[in-house]
Amino acid sequence: MAIEKTLSILKPDAVKNNITGKINSYIESSGLKIIAQKMMLLTKKQAELFYEIHKDRPFFGELVEFMTSGSVIVQVLVGENAVSKYRQIMGATNPKQADKGTIRGDFADDISENRVHGSDSLENARKEIAFFFAECELV
């Protein structure tokens, strides 16, 4: 099994509702390790660049507005098959379809405020990690 890194973002709704510790517990209980973490307030420009892949989708403006509405916590997770493992822990994008025992299944109610973001591929994980972290921050 491959040791991988992936990006996690605890979105403004997770920070606002004070459930970041609970989410971190789900992450760590799965065997993934948090090797870098910082709280930040995304600028509109940062959010637009990060979610650029969605720029032509009807929800893009709402997504950017939401992601800049409060603090987020960006994290780098490491472990065996970290990308797919974290996606399993997060649960389905739509919380109504997410299994109980997943972050979204247990803590989210709405697809537009679904608590967390996780990289969807190893290639995107590398890009997303580099967007937020310098190599020297990954210890």
Swiss-Prot record:
Superkingdom as given in the UniProt entry: Bacteria
* InterPro entries with a match to the protein in the record: NDK-like_dom (IPR034907), NDK-like_dom_sf (IPR036850), Nucleoside_diP_kinase (IPR001564), Nucleoside_diP_kinase_AS (IPR023005)
The record's subcellular locations are: Cytoplasm
What the entry lists under Pfam families is as follows: NDK (PF00334)
Q: Which Gene3D superfamilies match?
A: Nucleoside diphosphate kinase-like domain (3.30.70.141)
Q: What is its EC number?
A: 2.7.4.6
GO terms for cellular component = cytoplasm
Extract the GO molecular function terms from the UniProt entry.
Answer: ATP binding; metal ion binding; nucleoside diphosphate kinase activity
Cofactors needed by this protein, per the record, are: Mg(2+)
The record describes the protein's role as:
Major role in the synthesis of nucleoside triphosphates other than ATP. The ATP gamma phosphate is transferred to the NDP beta phosphate via a ping-pong mechanism, using a phosphorylated active-site intermediate.
What is said about its interaction partners and assembly?
Homotetramer.
- Family to which this protein belongs: Belongs to the NDK family.
In its UniProt entry, what is this protein called?
Nucleoside diphosphate kinase
